[in-house]
């Protein structure tokens, strides 16, 4: 496409936005939005600043694909444990790694085998492929550094960027994993099993605890519920390394930017294109996209609130072609309001609301909420309003220059096997293995990568006052 210098009117670039920008393929939509985009401006509000390409070029070349004003209504937290284990602990959920360990060991001691006679597993992971970032790498940042998810990086209060797998806190966390491995709590196959093996193992109900992302382990929970093993599903936890840290699962980092829809220089009528995008951002456009057609896909109750019939909900959940046939949530890449957001007159933009999430809790979740005195499971976490709004979006989502991405890849290719070696070695070998990994990272551009990433982030900082 770039080689031929020929483009469609609009393009959802995903990871190729930088290439298109550098080729001059995307037009700056700033003036078009100012003249023809009142709904675009309303949707993004103060976060319009984050749509700007950089401080050097404040043009807007994409509208973000991610939900604006997204509310986190469910979360896996920093790690997870089976509801059965939490129930046996009188629903006193762990907040520190030490408490997490004690709960896992206590449940294993009381239940060494499954009803089928298989050995229970304390913790397992999927670390033989790219999922190592999800189950081995990311939890280290969430638990040890108490950092929000910025990919392989942590950002300090001065907006300096650091590669996370060299911090003192992560050293302590991986030393803990090493001990769990040598004590037989961590699955000996955690770094060699395939992701399919991992999914099957977790879905069997044998694994007491996991350190995973909700989107990844949710497929296991669907199987567990179908098999009548609801108590073996998982509760997300606000676990951190130390008591003085605050887990940040609910911290709102603002609209995720980096991927989105843009208008190309080949578009003969960019005014028409921006008007189309503006319509999609309107209340009418958003309700049509998320809910469908009134009287067909949804109805209004006596209070003017939308609802879907049980038949429609079942169809949406079971028909693989539902989105394609109805158009509801089918065309990804366009700007949308996030779950849990409402119009000015109180109309929920999406069917996923606080009320719908609570209504869909399984029996273990409902019993847990009642026992802990929570309305929602997210009530056990620090709430969004407790955090300051950050002047940057999630770092992993930005379109980074190729040379910067290559620097990270070099570090990751060292850290992945290095961390596995740290965990699977003996406890006496840990310090030496850790120091060896850090030295290899240092010798392969660690400081240069951190400096380059810090400089990159500096171009993305916006005023949030």
Give the label of every model feature segment.
Residues 126-152, 178-347:
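Extracytoplasmic/periplasmic substrate-binding proteins
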Residues 1-55, 84-95, 112-115, 130-132, ...:
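Extracytoplasmic "Venus flytrap"/periplasmic binding protein-like
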Residues 109-126, 287-290, 443-454:
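Bilobed periplasmic-binding protein-like "clamshell/Venus-flytrap" ligand-binding domains
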Residues 17-24, 30, 49-93, 127-166, ...:
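Periplasmic solute-binding protein
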Residues 9-13, 28, 61-65, 78-80, ...:
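Structural recognition of the beta-strand scaffold that forms the well-ordered cores
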Residues 417-465:
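Histidine-centered catalytic/metal-binding microenvironments
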Residues 285-418:
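Conserved small-residue motifs centered on glycine
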Residues 28-46, 92, 144-168, 242-250, ...:
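Short, solvent-exposed loop/beta-turn-alpha elements that line the ligand-binding surface or hinge
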């Amino acid at each position: 496409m770039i080689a031929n210098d020929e483009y469609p009117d609009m393009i959802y670039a995903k990871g190729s936005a930088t290439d298109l920008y550098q080729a001059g393929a995307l037009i700056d939509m700033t003036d078009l939005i100012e003249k023809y985009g009142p709904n675009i401006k309303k949707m993004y509000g103060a976060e319009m600043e984050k749509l700007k390409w950089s401080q050097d070029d404040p043009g807007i070349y994409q509208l973000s694909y991610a939900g604006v004003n997204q509310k986190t209504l469910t979360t896996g937290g920093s790690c997870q444990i089976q509801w059965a284990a939490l129930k046996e602990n009188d629903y006193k959920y762990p907040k520190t790694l030490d408490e997490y360990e004690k709960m896992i060991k206590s449940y294993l001691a009381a239940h060494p085998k499954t009803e089928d006679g298989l050995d229970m597993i304390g913790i397992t992971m999927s670390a033989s492929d790219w999922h190592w970032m999800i189950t081995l790498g990311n939890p280290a940042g969430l638990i040890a550094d108490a950092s929000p998810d910025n990919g392989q990086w942590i950002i300090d209060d001065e907006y300096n960027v650091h590669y996370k797998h060299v911090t003192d806190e992560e050293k302590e966390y991986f030393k803990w994993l090493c001990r769990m491995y040598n004590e037989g709590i961590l699955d000996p196959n955690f770094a060699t099993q395939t992701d399919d093996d991992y999914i099957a193992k977790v879905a069997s109900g044998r694994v007491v605890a996991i350190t995973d992302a909700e989107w990844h382990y949710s497929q296991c929970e669907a199987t567990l519920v179908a098999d009548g093993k609801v108590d073996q599903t998982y509760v997300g936890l606000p676990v951190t390394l130390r008591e003085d840290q605050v887990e940040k699962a609910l911290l709102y980092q603002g609209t995720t930017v980096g991927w989105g829809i843009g208008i190309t220089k080949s578009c003969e009528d960019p005014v028409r294109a921006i008007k189309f995008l503006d319509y999609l951002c309107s209340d009418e456009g958003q309700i049509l996209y998320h809910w469908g057609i009134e009287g067909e896909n949804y109805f209004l109750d006596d209070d003017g609130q939308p609802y879907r019939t049980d038949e429609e909900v079942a169809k949406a959940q079971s028909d693989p072609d539902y989105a394609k046939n109805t158009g509801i949530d089918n065309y990804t890449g366009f700007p949308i309001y996030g779950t849990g957001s409402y119009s000015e007159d109180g109309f929920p933009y999406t069917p996923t609301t606080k009320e719908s999430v609570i209504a869909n809790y399984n029996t273990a979740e409902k019993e847990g909420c009642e026992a802990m005195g929570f309305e929602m499971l997210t009530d056990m976490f620090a709430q969004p309003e407790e955090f300051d709004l950050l002047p940057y979006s999630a770092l992993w989502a930005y379109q980074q220059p190729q040379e910067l991405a290559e620097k990270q890849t070099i570090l990751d290719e060292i850290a992945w096997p290095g961390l596995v070696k740290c965990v699977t070695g003996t406890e006496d070998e840990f310090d030496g293995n850790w120091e060896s990994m850090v030295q290899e990272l240092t010798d392969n551009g660690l400081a240069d990568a951190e400096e380059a990433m810090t400089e990159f982030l500096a171009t993305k900082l916006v005023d949030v006052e």
